[in-house]
Amino acid sequence: MHAPGALFYVGDPHHAMGDGEVALTAMEGSLRGTFRLTVCKEGEGDAPRLAHRYPFAETADAWIPIGLSDPDGSVDGQGSDLDVALRTAVVNALEFLEQELGMDRAIAYAYLSAAADFTISQVVDRTVGVHGIIAKSHFA
């Protein structure tokens, strides 16, 4: 199913995969799932504003800003695709901390540097990804 602006994709399940998926494969597996999707309009519900423009995940324990590179490679000399993905994840994390938690940008930057974890999601496809982990316990 394709819907413009849906920002939802599921597939390519892995039973095991190291951080970064570097060799085009992992412990592949089958997937059977039931999903219930709810349309969340901007300004309504609990979804952060950022999630309406860019992939963003949330678990019971963490907020997860995501950064992806351009599948066609670097643009305007911005550096490697991984650099672009990391920069995008950090910018998305900053926006989340400022807009949703009311944090000053300079404090948010310092927090991300000192306490958040940024991990390579995968580098095997044309689009590479980085995701951040912002622990909710830091804000309890």
Regions flagged by a language model, labelled:
Residues 50-106, 111:
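A hydrophobic, small-residue-rich beta->alpha segment in the mid-to-C-terminal subdomain
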Residues 1-53, 91, 105-106, 111-129, ...:
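Glycine-rich anion/phosphate-binding loop at the beta-strand->alpha-helix junction
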